[in-house]
Amino acid sequence: MLFILILLLVVATIVSTAYLTEKGEALAVRTNYQKCHYDIVHENLPDLSDYHWLYDLLLGAFVAPYIFYYGTYDAGAVGSVWVWLVVCVFIFRCLTISVTIPTQTTHVKRDFGNWLKRHLTGTAHDLCFSGHVSFAFSLVLVGLHFGIISNRVLWFGLLACLGLFSAMSRSHFSIDIVMAVPIVMTFFDWTMCQSASKDTIFGGCDCAPDIITM
């Protein structure tokens, strides 16, 4: 199930890339090459960059259930999740040094906070994929899998709001948010399968698909 979903996402990515490339070239000509990319959210929804701080505040809502959770954590499960997060960070690092966005990001300036962003949690010119959405999606999947949270509609709805707001606040391009989903799902499935002593990444392991489809 998850393997089929990822294949569909790959096809959708190829088609959307071709479409957005064409739109981007037209936009570059129309604006005399002042803008050489096209983003469906940036071009059609309001600019909320002045409310960028709400982006981090909304992420805090995903952390809260873990702070107030009074149950017992399984040490093996926690170890598996840590491995999964490290793999995601490794993939993120690989992408940030190899994927260059077409225009300079205006929110990166040479002050202390953004210096940390460039050297530890992000870069000055590369944003793929969204760390906020990846982390929030990870918390939702872990919470549902281990019973820390239960309302799927609420949390996936809140996750969609976080993704939309991250694009509207100009923190990310839309593709950064979309790419976070298959990456997190793939490595969540892999780590849960490994913790359950499965031999394959997708075959025989139904932990991630159950969370998504139920």
Locations of the language-model features?
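Alpha-helical transmembrane segments of integral membrane proteins
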Residues: 2-13, 80-85, 151-157
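Non-transmembrane, juxtamembrane loop and terminal tail segments
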Residues: 200-214
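Membrane-embedded catalytic cores of phosphoryl/pyrophosphoryl-handling enzymes
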Residues: 116-204
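Membrane-interface helix-boundary motifs at transmembrane edges
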Residues: 31-36, 69-81, 147-150
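Interfacial segments of alpha-helical transmembrane regions
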Residues: 63-99
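C-terminal TM-helix exit segments that contain a strictly Trp-centered aromatic cap at the helix terminus
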Residues: 17-25, 92-105
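Membrane-interface interhelical connector segments
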Residues: 105-121
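N-terminal transmembrane-helix/juxtamembrane module of multi-pass inner/ER membrane proteins
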Residues: 1-66, 108-109, 113, 209-211
